[in-house]
Amino acid sequence: MSSLKNLFSVDAELSKRTKLFISILGWCLLLGIWWLITAYEWINPYILPSPQKVFGSYAVLLSEKELISQIGYSVSINLLGYIQAVVIAIPLGFIIGLIPFFRELIIKQIGAARFTPLPATTAIFMAIFGVGLNLKIQFLAFGIFLYLLPAIVQRIDEIKTDDHLRAVKQTMITLNASPWQMFKHFYAPSVLSRFFPDIINLVAVSWTYIVIAELLNAQGGLGYLIYLATNRHTHIEQVYAIIILIILIGIIQDYLLKALDRKLFKFKYA
């Protein structure tokens, strides 16, 4: 394990084992502080229930609320909406970022669209997509798309100012690379390798939108369970339990996407 001096030194390197130990310690401290606060009721138990009560509520959620199927419902909406947003944002982002006419035509409108208050658009989405599952998927996809599209355009702009990448681009031009070769061997790998972390980071945002989406003609999902628990004002421990579950799902998604990033763009980690 790293020496105590390294633990508090500026920019010091720690071993993987030490990092894991500190990470586990952090979670244990958080759980201990939570237990201490609730044991002495420093905060109203209705506002902050005890860890025992929160984790004990999973039994009720599993037996009475069909928790497993609700998880599947929410994860399916998340994946379908996210994949749709990514599939649309990537080609459109390249068109806007690389072709001057389209950039000047709509880049400012795209930037302004990020300020759209999504909850206020629910009535519009219901009018267009009805009240079924597709409504929730399209609402989520739109919310993510608003952030992904400007992000990929920004990544294209960044490679234009990178000295190393500019040199690579100039070399390809000197070798008379075709536009398709330039895109395939230069723009696509350079931009997507920088853009993938944006995809990962927006997973967290997507779960915020899911809670909103699932309340549109509520039919199920984790957001719907949160609504039921808060609406009755008697099951606040279930709210905490579901929030913890959403965080756990997000951590798993984050881990899987980072593993995919390392597999797709090995040159970043060479």
Give, region by region, the residue ranges found by the protein language model.
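Transmembrane alpha-helical segments of polytopic membrane transport and secretion proteins
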Residues: 1-25, 255-270
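N-terminal signal-anchor transmembrane alpha helix
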Residues: 14-42
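Transmembrane alpha-helix signature in integral membrane proteins
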Residues: 64-95
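Loop-to-helix entry region at the N-terminal start of transmembrane alpha-helices
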Residues: 69-77, 127-149, 238-243
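Membrane-cytosol interface at the C-terminal ends of specific transmembrane alpha-helices
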Residues: 133-202
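C-terminal transmembrane helix and the adjacent membrane-cytosol boundary/short C-terminal tail
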Residues: 197, 239-270
